[in-house]
UniProtKB/Swiss-Prot annotation:
Its main location: plastid. GO terms for cellular component: chloroplast thylakoid membrane. Keywords: Chloroplast, Membrane, Photosynthesis, Plastid, Repeat, Thylakoid, TPR repeat. TPR repeats lie at residues 35-68, 72-105, 120-153. The keyword Flavoprotein does not apply. This is Photosystem I assembly protein Ycf3. Belongs to the Ycf3 family. The gene is ycf3.
Length: 168
């Protein structure tokens, strides 16, 4: 059964209804409609914590979707799932791939920075200050890119950059 028929929450139902209307009125190919249906179902499964189902839908959407911009959001969402699962190396790979197709995804830069910062903290706990500093510097670079795209966002990151002397 398509996920759009089993969504229980109001927001998911509303999104599904609006998406179905748009799919009917906007001139798109059958493949584009099918790709969007998989993407929509992936987002729905992801919001419910059904990551395996979400990944299946996203991979199918990637197989069908040809637009680089749309593919960037699919890749970004795959990265989110890997982040949630603690698979940080895979997550970074998918965020990079998303940014290759759409360099205006501040949320991807932010998530990459968060992962690098986390790895820096891990290195501190392990007593490796040199590795920690490298991770923190990489986090700073990603946060600077996110902030450059959306200057009013990521206030905590901006504060961290200032406190640590990494804000230019």
């Amino acid at each position: 059964m398509p996920r759009s028929r089993i969504n229980g929450n109001f927001i998911d139902k509303t999104f599904s209804i609006v998406a179905n209307i748009l799919l009917r009125i906007i001139p798109t190919t059958v493949g584009e409609k099918e790709a969007f249906t998989y993407y929509r179902d992936g987002m729905s499964a992801q919001s419910e914590g059904n990551y395996a189902e979400a990944l299946q839908n996203y991979y199918e959407a990637m197989r069908l979707e040809i637009d680089p911009y749309d593919r960037s959001y699919i890749l970004y969402n795959i990265g989110l799932i890997h982040t949630s699962n603690g698979e940080h190396t895979k997550a970074l790979e998918y965020y990079f791939r998303a940014l290759e197709r759409n360099p205006f995804l501040p949320q991807a830069f932010n998530n990459m920075a968060v992962i690098c910062h986390y790895r820096g903290e891990q290195a501190v706990r392990q007593g490796d200050s040199e590795i920690a500093e490298a991770w923190f510097n990489q986090a700073a670079e990603y946060w600077k890119q996110a902030i450059a795209l959306t200057p009013g966002n990521y206030i905590q990151a901006q504060n961290w950059l200032k406190i640590t002397g990494r804000f230019e």
